[in-house]
Every structure is written in C-alpha cells, then in structure tokens.
C-alpha cells in the first residue's frame, strides 16, 4: 500500500516573515495527517522553515537545484548546500523550469542522480501542454519525459522517487483534469515505469497529481486507484486550504 504524499510548492512567494507565519498556523492543522506532508518554500526561507518544523510531521523540500557540487554557476544552489540545511525533498523538472529556463529531460536526469547521491528524494515532474493533449500525443510526450528522466537509475532509487503528473494546461489556470483523465494518465506513467524497471517498482513508486488542486477536488482525486497524492501550488499558500487538502 502506497502512502499518500501531499507537497506544497510555494513557487516565488512569501518572504521570511510571511513564511514562518504560514508554517506556525499550519503545524497544528496537519498534526494528525495520515499522509506525508512536504513544504517547498523559496530558497531564502528553507533554513528557517526546516528549523520551524523540527519535531513535527512536516518535511521540507527545495523547488530546484543544480546537478554540480560547486563551481561558476551564478545564482544556482547545489545539492550539498540543500543537504546541509537538512532538506529532505527537491522538486525537479517543474513545467515552469522547463518553460522559462529551458530545462531539458537530460538535465533533469542529471539532477535526479545527484539528488540521490545526497540522500534527497526527488519529486520529478512531467506533463503535457494543451496542444499536445488536443493532438492526442499525451502518452507519447509523457513516455518520452519519463524514459529520459529516469534513465540509468537503480531500481531501489526509482522506488523512492515521487513523480508528479502536472498537465501544463491545468497549472494556475483554474482548469483541472477530470478524475478519470488524471487517473488514466497516471496509470500510463506507471506502465512506463513498469517497462523500465519492472512491475514491483511501478507498484511502489508514488505518483501525485498537480494541476490547480483545491480542497473541493482533492477527495475525489484521492479516491482514484493510481493517484497517490498532490503537488499543490496556489492553495499551499493558504494554511486552511492546504490543511484541508492534507486532511482529505
């Protein structure tokens, strides 16, 4: 039985004071959660948030990282830096990174491997555009993304990975894939993993849905057999809303 995981991606929101205020309000609201709870604040808030949630059931993730340990990469953060802050997770390959920063599947693969070297769990994102869905190539696009992202990993690494299916057309638009669309697409992703690393790995890997997730939609989504959680954007910035999603 796969344990659900709900992660909040704050994106480029919240200064340090606002971040700590949000966390303090959230902590008692999710104390009894049956799922894994992860917060992914901006880099500048990571250290303070890690310290604030110490001793609670909340884990902390970063929103991105570089695949090199150090060097002349102005503005970048290394996996070793994240590990020194006691970060447990890192989002890799978010659609906004692909769109605005031209991040490629091969780069994502390098980041995944480097995250594992530092015992950081990758939340690996994949998803299709509206045009790709309308053209009927969703499965082809996702298959390519997953095959390249998970290339040359060990089976035990794949079993630890969290995959987030985020239809690009549903991010920040208010549009949401139907529960059946989301479940069927995630089932396809699981099938790709099965062909690469075997049925056991595919059954163990946790796959989230991420696309305008709200308190009103989460319960039905979590009733789908292949959906193991959510990567939450805007709703994670509101403690009451995020808690309602966590406590679905």
From Swiss-Prot:
Annotated NCBIfam families: tim
PROSITE patterns found in the cross-reference section: TIM_1, TIM_2
**Protein's UniProt name:** Triosephosphate isomerase
Functionally, this protein is described as follows: Involved in the gluconeogenesis. Catalyzes stereospecifically the conversion of dihydroxyacetone phosphate (DHAP) to D-glyceraldehyde-3-phosphate (G3P).
Q: Which UniProt keywords apply?
A: Cytoplasm, Gluconeogenesis, Glycolysis, Isomerase
Q: Which reaction does it catalyse?
A: D-glyceraldehyde 3-phosphate = dihydroxyacetone phosphate
Summarize the subunit comment.
Homodimer.
Q: Annotated pathway, please?
A: Carbohydrate biosynthesis; gluconeogenesis; Carbohydrate degradation; glycolysis; D-glyceraldehyde 3-phosphate from glycerone phosphate: step 1/1
Q: Per its UniProt record, what InterPro entries does this chain match?
A: Aldolase_TIM, TIM_sf, TrioseP_Isoase_bac/euk, Triosephosphate_isomerase, Triosephosphate_isomerase_AS
Give the similarity note: Belongs to the triosephosphate isomerase family.
Mind telling me which Pfam families this protein's record contains?
TIM (PF00121)
A cellular component annotation (GO) from this entry? cytosol
Gene source species: Clostridium kluyveri (strain ATCC 8527 / DSM 555 / NBRC 12016 / NCIMB 10680 / K1)
């Amino acid at each position: 039985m796969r344990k659900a995981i709900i992660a909040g991606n704050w994106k480029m929101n919240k200064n340090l004071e606002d971040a700590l205020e949000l966390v303090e309000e959230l902590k008692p609201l999710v104390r009894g959660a049956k799922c894994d709870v992860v917060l992914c604040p901006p880099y500048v808030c990571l250290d303070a948030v890690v310290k604030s949630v110490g001793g609670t059931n909340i884990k902390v993730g970063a929103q991105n990282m570089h695949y090199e340990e150090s060097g002349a990469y102005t503005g970048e953060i290394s996996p070793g830096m994240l590990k020194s802050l006691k970060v447990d997770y890192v989002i890799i390959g978010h659609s906004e990174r692909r769109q605005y920063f031209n991040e490629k599947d091969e780069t994502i693969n390098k980041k995944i491997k480097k995250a594992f070297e530092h015992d950081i769990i990758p939340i690996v994102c994949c998803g299709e555009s509206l045009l790709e869905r309308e053209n009927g190539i969703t499965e082809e696009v996702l298959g390519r993304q997953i095959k390249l992202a998970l290339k040359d990993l060990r089976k035990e690494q794949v079993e630890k990975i969290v995959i987030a299916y985020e239809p690009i057309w549903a991010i920040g638009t208010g549009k949401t894939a139907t529960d059946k669309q989301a479940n069927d697409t995630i089932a396809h992703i699981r099938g790709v993993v099965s062909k690469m690393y075997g049925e056991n790995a595919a059954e163990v890997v946790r796959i989230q849905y991420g696309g305008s997730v709200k308190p009103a939609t989460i319960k039905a989504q979590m009733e789908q057999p292949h959906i193991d959680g959510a990567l939450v954007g805007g709703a994670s910035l509101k403690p009451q809303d995020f808690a309602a999603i966590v406590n679905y």
